Structures are given as C-alpha cells and as structure tokens.
Amino acid sequence: TGVQTCALPILAARKIHDSETKKHLIECAKAEFMEKGFARASLRNICQEAGDTTGALYFFFHDKDDLFCEIVGDFMDRLNAIIKEHYSHEVKEADRGYENEHDDSLDFECTKKLVHEIYQHRDEVLMVLTKSQGSTMENVMDRLVDQMDEHNAFICKAMCKANDVHMVDKKVVHWMSHSQVDMFIFMVTHIDNEKEALAFAEKGMEYLIAGWYAIVK
C-alpha cells in the first residue's frame, strides 16, 4: 500500500507533464501551420521548436493531419453545433406549415453566435480557409455548403408550399447556399475585429433574407 500511495503523486505529475507537453506541441504546430500551411509544414520543425522528440509528438498524434485536426476540430464542432441548433428551429417551423411567419430574429441570433465563435478562434478559421490544402480539412467549406444546401432545399420547398409558390430551381437554392457561406468567408478574411464583423454580417443577413423572401413568397 505504501508503494501504491507513493505512485499516485508520480502519476499525477506525469499527467500534468504530458498535458503541458501536448499543449506546447499544439502551440508550436499552430505557428508552423499558420506560417507554411499544412502541406509545407514540417513535424521535425514543430518538435524542434517545442524542444521535444518526434516520438513525443507521435505519442499524442497519429500523423500531421491528426495534429492539424486537433487544432481546428473543437472549433469546427462548436460551429456545427450552432448551425444545427438553428436548423432545428427552422425545421420545426416548416413542420408546422409556417402557421406563423418565419421568425427572422432567430437568423440574426444565429449570426451573432457564429460571428462571436469565429472571432474567438479567428486563427483557426483562417487555418481552415487558407492553410488546410492537403489535409482532411481541405474541403470542409464545400461540405458545409452541401450540408446547408440540403437544409435550404427542404426549407425552400416547405415555404413555397405554404405560400402556394412554384418550387425554386435547385441551382438557385445551391447558389444561395454558397452565398451564405461566402458572406462569412469574406467577413473573416477582410475584417479584423468582431464588432465591425457583426455589423457587416447583420447587413449581409438583411440582404440574404430579403432575397430569400423575394423568391418564396
């Protein structure tokens, strides 16, 4: 029992050391990816900057892609959660046959959440947008457009039915899905601070919503 008691603080210290090592590797990797992009980034350089061996890196991460995804993955999960929560509200409205008018305030509330999340993790966003070529995150924006397109097609069909309007051409819906994503991409790549970004995004949403209503009513 004495040996077991002594082992506990040793294990705790090792966990703390491992946690600090992993955190430092991630910090150095983020700097390397931001400077060189995924394809040109070197695991050897990352380890040298971190003062660790490649063995230490492979203890925590399977490969370079796993390391890249570790840096941006949590943010992408939170972003997706915000979007899916918004989708659920819109699906409920559609399922009720739009017995009441669509609540535009939900669109602006979602926009505010997205802008805040994006600017809390702007480096990670820019990594995905501009530094991810060659990684499994390379086409994540295309996948987001596809996800949005599927949802928008469902909502558009429901709105057209409720308003007795002929269904909008799917290519137009697809273009509108691109426009929604492109608005946020333009925002994060051209605007440096959250306050200005939110003002831009709110105007952008007014424009997108007006265009949406113009073809479904």
What are these regions (language model features)?
Residues 24, 28, 32-66, 70:
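Helix-turn-helix
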